[in-house]
A protein has these predicted regions:
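Bacterial Sec-dependent N-terminal signal peptides
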Residues: 1-26
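Glycan-recognition and catalytic cores of secretory/periplasmic carbohydrate-active enzymes
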Residues: 24-575
C-alpha cells in the first residue's frame, strides 16, 4: 500500500511527490488518497469500471497513435480512426486514452491496461525524440501552423486557429495525458516528456505580445493554464507559472473577479477548464481573488444554470439563466464533458474548504449524469443527455465514434475512486460518497459495504493490519437530502449518539479490529423545479433523479455511426 497525500488537489498528488517544491501553495483542508489505495467492490460503479476496461482494450492503440507518428514524420503502423480522428481533431483521443489508461491502471492494477499504457507512452516518446525539440502533437500539418503562431501570425476563432480545428484544445489532451501518466500511474518518463513539451510551447509563444496571446485564447484551448500550473508545481519552477498566466483567458476571468455572470450565449465546456486553471493557479499562488472567482463560477453554474442531474447547457452553450425552455425541449441537452469538468472543479474547491455542499453536487452529478452516460451492456458513451421527455440518447461504438465525450467518457469510469474518501493528517478520515469499496490507510483497512441507493444507509468496517487499535475521527457526510434529526448511527449494533458538525457525523474513538459502524439515512420523495422557476419539476428519491418508462419507438441511430454528427439523436422528437 502506498499512501500518497495530495497537498494541491484535483487529479494531483504533487506535494507528496514533490516535498521540496519551491512554490508556496494553499494548505488544503482535506487531502486525497492515491486512487490506487481505493478499490471498488460490487456495485453499478464497479460494473461501469469493468465495462470501461473492455472499451479501452477494444481500441487499437496504433490507430490512436497514427496522428502522432505522422506529426513526427514517422510511418504510422495503422490508419487513423475515422470520425473526429481523421477530420481535423486527429490525436485528441490519444491524449484522453493516455489519461484513462493511467487512472484505470492505478484504480485496478490490471496488467493488460498497464502494458497498454507503457506501449502508448513509449510510442509517444519515440515521436517526441524524433521531433528533437519537445514537440508532440497529432494536429494535421501541425508544424506549419505552429510556425505561423511562433511568427506572430494568429488567426483565431472560437472553434479554429490558423485554419485548424481547435489545435490548442487538441494538444491540451496530450499535456493532460502525460501529466496523468506521471502523477497517477507514476511513469517517470512521462515527467520528462511533459516538461519538454511545455518548454516547446513556451518557446513557440515567447514572442507573442499579451494582446496576441489573448486573441489566440479566443480559440478553444482546454485547460492549458491548469497543465502549465501543474508543471510549475512538479518542477518548482515559477517560469511555468508565468506561462500558466499567459494562457489564462482574461475575457472570462475578469467578470468572475467582479462576481459577474457573463456566461449566457458562450460555449460552456470551453470555459469550465479555464476556470479549473484559475483555481489551480490560485492554489499555487495563494491567490484568494482568483479562488473566489472560481468559486463564483461554480456557484453560478451549479445553482443557476444546472438541472437536477448536475448537467448544464443546451446545444453545448449556456442559455439564459432565467429561461430553461430550450433545456426542456431540445434533443441536445447537457453535455457529458461539461459535467466531467465540473466534477474536476468541484474536487479542487472541496479540498481547500472541506465544505460538504460541494460533495452534495458531486454525488448528484456522479450518480445521475456520469454513471448514466455509459451503456451498461455494450459500454458506449453519451454526448448529450436530453431533458426532453420521451427522447433518447446516442451511444458511441469503439470503432466508429471519437467525439470529445468519448475521450472524457474513457476517463470518467476509471475515476470513481477519487472522491469516495479523504483525510486530514493521520487522525481524520472522511467518507464522502456511499459507494461499495475498500481503502488502505496506513496500518488499517476500511471497507464500505452498502447497496445504496437501494439501501438507505451505509456500513464502514475497520480492519487493523497489525491487530492494534487506532484512534481517529471518522467523518461521514450528512447529505442535503436527509431530513434534520432522521439520521441514526450504530457501532457494533449499539445505538450511538449522533454528533454532527460541519456537515459530517463525527465519531472519535479508538477503533479496534472488526469495528463496524452503520449510518441510516432515510430518503424521501421530493420535487425540484428548474432554476428558472418555470414549474417544470424533477422528482427525486434521496439524491436520485427518477424517470418513467416510456416507449422505444423511432430511436434512430441509438448506436452511433462514424458520421461527423453521429453523436446527435437523429430520430423524431417524441412525444
Amino acid at each position: 500500500m502506498k499512501l500518497i497525500t495530495q497537498k494541491l488537489v484535483g487529479l494531483l498528488f504533487l506535494a507528496a511527490l514533490n516535498p521540496t517544491t519551491a512554490l508556496a501553495q494553499t494548505e488544503p483542508k482535506v487531502e486525497y488518497f492515491d486512487i490506487s489505495d481505493v478499490r471498488l467492490t460490487r456495485s453499478a460503479f464497479k460494473h461501469a469500471e469493468d465495462m470501461d476496461i473492455q472499451y479501452l482494450l477494444a481500441l487499437n492503440p496504433d490507430r490512436l497513435l497514427a496522428p502522432y507518428l505522422k506529426g513526427a514524420g514517422l510511418e504510422p503502423k495503422a490508419d487513423n480512426y475515422p470520425n473526429w480522428e481523421n477530420t481535423g481533431l486527429d490525436g485528441h483521443i490519444g491524449g484522453h486514452y493516455l489519461s484513462a489508461l493511467s487512472f484505470m491502471y492505478a484504480a485496478t492494477g490490471n496488467e493488460e491496461i498497464g502494458r497498454r499504457l507503457d506501449y502508448v507512452l513509449s510510442e509517444m516518446k519515440r515521436c517526441q525524440d524524433t521531433a528533437g525539440d519537445g514537440y508532440l502533437c497529432g494536429v494535421p500539418d501541425g508544424r506549419k501552423m505552429w510556425k505561423e503562431i511562433e511568427q506572430g501570425n494568429v488567426r483565431a476563432a472560437t472553434f479554429g486557429l490558423n485554419d485548424r480545428w481547435v489545435p490548442l484544445y487538441n494538444i491540451h489532451k496530450t499535456y493532460a495525458g502525460l501529466r496523468d501518466a506521471y502523477l497517477v500511474a507514476h511513469r517517470e518518463e512521462a515527467k520528462d516528456m511533459l516538461i519538454k513539451l511545455t518548454d516547446w510551447m513556451e518557446r513557440t509563444t515567447a514572442n507573442l505580445t499579451d494582446e496576441q496571446m489573448q486573441d489566440m485564447l479566443r480559440s478553444e484551448h482546454g485547460g492549458l493554464n491548469e497543465t502549465f500550473a501543474d508543471v510549475a508545481a512538479i518542477t518548482g519552477n515559477k517560469r511555468y507559472l508565468k506561462l500558466a498566466h499567459r494562457f489564462s483567458h482574461e475575457i472570462i476571468l475578469n467578470p468572475l473577479l467582479k462576481q459577474e455572470d457573463k456566461l449566457t450565449g458562450i460555449h460552456a465546456n470551453t470555459q469550465i477548464p479555464k476556470v479549473i486553471g484559475f483555481k489551480r493557479i490560485a492554489d499555487i499562488e495563494k491567490n484568494n481573488e482568483w479562488s473566489k472567482a472560481a468559486d463564483f463560477f461554480w456557484q453560478t453554474v451549479v445553482n443557476n444554470r444546472s438541472i437536477t442531474i448536475g448537467g448544464n447547457s443546451v446545444y453545448e452553450h449556456f442559455h439564459p439563466a432565467d429561461n430553461f425552455e430550450s433545456m426542456r425541449t431540445s434533443e441536445q441537452g447537457p453535455e457529458t464533458c461539461n459535467t466531467y469538468n465540473m466534477l474536476r472543479l468541484t474536487k479542487l474547491l472541496y479540498a481547500t474548504s472541506a465544505n460538504s455542499r460541494y460533495m452534495d453536487y458531486y454525488e448528484r452529478a456522479l450518480f445521475n449524469h456520469i454513471l448514466s452516460t455509459q451503456d451498461p451492456v455494450q459500454g458506449g458513451f453519451v454526448y448529450f443527455t436530453p431533458m426532453r421527455s420521451g427522447h433518447y440518447r446516442v451511444y458511441s461504438q469503439p470503432q466508429t465514434s471519437f467525439w470529445c465525450c468519448v475521450g472524457s467518457g474513457l476517463e470518467n469510469h476509471a475515476r470513481y475512486g477519487e472522491m469516495i474518501y479523504a483525510h486530514k493528517g493521520n487522525d481524520q478520515l472522511y467518507v464522502n460518497l456511499f459507494i461499495p469499496s475498500t481503502l488502505e490507510w496506513g496500518d488499517i483497512n476500511i471497507e464500505q459495504s452498502t447497496s445504496f441507493p437501494d439501501e438507505e444507509g451505509t456500513s464502514v468496517i475497520v480492519t487493523s493490519k497489525k491487530g492494534k487499535n487506532k484512534k481517529f475521527t471518522l467523518n461521514i457526510r450528512v447529505p442535503e437530502w436527509v431530513n434534520e434529526g432522521e439520521l441514526s448511527l450504530t457501532i457494533n449494533g449499539k445505538t450511538e449518539k449522533v454528533n454532527i458538525a460541519d456537515g459530517y457525523v463525527k465519531v472519535n474513538r479508538s477503533w479496534k479490529d472488526g469495528d463496524k459502524l452503520h449510518v441510516s439515512m432515510p430518503m424521501h420523495l421530493r420535487a425540484i423545479d428548474m432554476p428558472d422557476h418555470s414549474h417544470n419539476y424533477s422528482f427525486l428519491y434521496g439524491p436520485i433523479v427518477l424517470a418513467s418508462r416510456m416507449g422505444t419507438q423511432r430511436q434512430d441511430g441509438m448506436f452511433a455511426d462514424d458520421s461527423r454528427g453521429g453523436h446527435i439523436a437523429q430520430g423524431p422528437r417524441l412525444p
